[in-house]
Amino acid sequence: MLTLKTLRDDPQHVIEKLAVKNFDARAIVEKVLELDTNRRALQTESDAIVAKQNQLTKQIGGLMKDGKKAEAEEVKKEVAELKAKSSELLAKADENNKELEAQLVLLPNMPCDLVIPGKGAEDNQVVKMGGPEVNLPEHALPHWELAKKYDIIDFDLGVKLTGAGFPVYKGKGAKLQRALINFFLDINTAAGYKEVEPPIMVNAASGFGTGQLPDKEAQMYYVGLDDFYLIPTAEVPVTNIFRDVILGNNDFPQKMTAYTPCFRREAGSYGRDVRGLNRLHQFDKVEIVRIEKPENSYAALDEMVAHVEGIVNKLGLKYRILRLCGGDLSFTSAITYDFELWSAAQGRWLEISSVSNFETYQANRLHLRYRDAEGKMQLCHTLNGSSLALPRVVAALLEDNQKEDKIVIPEVLRPYTGFDCID
């Protein structure tokens, strides 16, 4: 979340930057500043009472030493009154601070200066396109029909077992999933990312730390009996590894990668966007996470974008990179680059990765800090990206590599699959 210092220093700047996200922050900012003023006034009053208590307590000791018990008893009454008032002030301060926190979490992260205003996806900026042109056979099929033709993904069986959005991968389809996961992890670890295998359920503190709670609670699966949430992305548990951590000045960068199943309710999804693998409730994804000093985070972001682009190029797929406009930027992100693959069979672009810099927004929630060269405590910057999300990668691989009688596996994946085609 945004720091109080940021709001105090230039509230108008905060309001203007959040307007780029189409978020009207004025009322919340004004309320936060009012509550912050109350907080400081209550703290000043409380400190004065504590100082007076300490003074009177010393006075009582002196009176007792001089045998002036009656006077000491009168001072004790005064101390008791101060204690009662102190308790009352603490209760007021606690209530005020809870309301202050509740208001602060309503404010999204401010977009960085590279982010332009815009209503939504239609206003995102295409910053790069690459990959080979796709040449499909005459009777090309979308991936859901290819999956049925070659018996590699069973959507109907998933409906029987669970419901829509929970496909069953079979035979070479299952092996392709496993191959992609291992391929992505190998590339990530070769680039210096440490592999971790985190839990796929997290507590509310973890969900709050990375900003999924309360903002995206409606999109998360909740396990009520145990008060856990199924993760929508490995970003949540991996970034929370650093919750309440103080790093040293020389502990950077922190680079981690993880494969996890991911779970998203995706309430309200309908139409062609949900056909086949286009939008699922359970899917596999490999994630990269970095913790950086503020002065290095944008260079790290560029490295992450180049890293993801390198993976896509190795797969030989047509892609484009978008810089999201303010209206399409997530609640927690300061800047995001999306990667999309071209599905010639569907005639549309499929998102496969988002790479984001959250600056200090998540770190402030996580209490993730470091001591700089002068020993001062500073907030870290957090970044993450999909490297990659599997469903739409699989969709594009199947569609763009189809021939009349088979699907050709990209050469880089063959050591992982053990086969060169699906037929």
Q: Locations of the language-model features?
A:
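TRNA-recognition modules of translation machinery and tRNA-sensing kinases, especially anticodon-binding
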Residues: R26, M129-D423
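N-terminal alpha-helical targeting/anchoring segments
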Residues: M1-V134, I152, D156
